[in-house]
Amino acid sequence: MTSRIDKTIARQREKIASGAYYEAHQQLRVIAARYIKQSNYEAAAEILAGGATALLRAGSQQGASASGGDLAIMLVDEVYTKAGWGITGGDDDAEGRARKKRLIELLREFPSEEPTRKRFIQEMIGWSGRFGPVERGDAELHHAAGSVYAEDNEPYDAEKHLVLGTSESAETLAKLEYEWYTNDEPHTAAIYASRAVFPYLLVGNLRNANKAFLVFTSRLSSSNTSLGVQEVSSASSDVRVFPSLPLLNFISMLLLTIQRGSADLFKQLTAHYASQIREVGIWDDALSQIGEQYFAIKVPRQGNPLLDMMGSMLFGGQNQGGSRRTPQGRSQSKTVEAPPASMELD
């Protein structure tokens, strides 16, 4: 059977190489549908994956990549989903890992400008959420999708996936936010750092929040030696202090406060930086949610503050051209505030 499938794929690849994209696309759909009707899902998967790869590599000429995207989506909808293929996430789930690997490899074949890529990502994540242990989707697939968007400088789409990704996603997200920040005013560093930190806090991933902050601030300090970064040490903590960037210090202190679980310190911290936080204008919902989530501080609110905040601040939106733009709510003031008064670290 494998030899027969290999021959089928080879014939269709020859058609694709000769420019007969539409003919190859239609024949691959028919052949795959025949295997699906026979419940021979493995054969259908090989046919669709092989054909999709060849068409995607042919590029956008005469709709080749669109045809490849169609076959990739068919692979998820008509094979993975209909077959009920699942992933357990365990070390012994070799089949699940192989199925994810096939999807990730296909994803990387999509040209960045191919419109069907977004639909493929949605279907891929949806399948993993339905047939995997995590309803919001598999972390490795989220990381793959977020990384692709990050490489293509599509930060809003990248953020939505990287925040639900793996431990590696924190570094990818922090680097993305830092590169984005370098196109903005120097005093806006905390705005971009918060986009790498707050989403992880809101999904309960304190480890990734700390990692993202460390990566961002390390790049900031190494690229801007004139910042005059101060290292402050105590019996239990080592903290970088940025005298000219108070809100960056706020984020650093916030992470320490969450680790200690001190509601009183959280209230003290937010009160101390209240004027700067008000000036930012987009952190209120996030901080209210963090206060409730980590310190049981309930604040009366209407609607769903988590979804509202993510939609309006962290995950933003795009202009009609799909290009990057400045995060909403960025302060236009270029005033560099005075360094904060010392706070107890122990």
Curated annotation (Swiss-Prot):
Keywords: Cytoplasm, ER-Golgi transport, Transport. It comes from the Eukaryota. The keyword Transmembrane does not apply. Pfam families: GET4. GO terms for cellular component: cytosol; TRC complex. It is found in: Cytoplasm. GO terms for biological process: protein insertion into ER membrane; vesicle-mediated transport. Transmembrane segments: none annotated. Its main location: cytoplasm. Residues 321-335 have a biased composition (Polar residues). Residues 317-346 are annotated as: Disordered. The keyword DNA repair does not apply. Component of the get4/get5/sgt2 sorting complex involved in the GET (guided entry of TA proteins) pathway that leads to the insertion of tail-anchored (TA) proteins into the endoplasmic reticulum. Get4 and get5 form an obligate complex that catalyzes the transfer of tail-anchored proteins destined to the endoplasmic reticulum from sgt2 to the cytosolic targeting factor which then targets the TA protein to the ER membrane via get1/get2. Belongs to the GET4 family. Component of the get4/get5/sgt2 sorting complex. This is Golgi to ER traffic protein 4. The gene is get4.
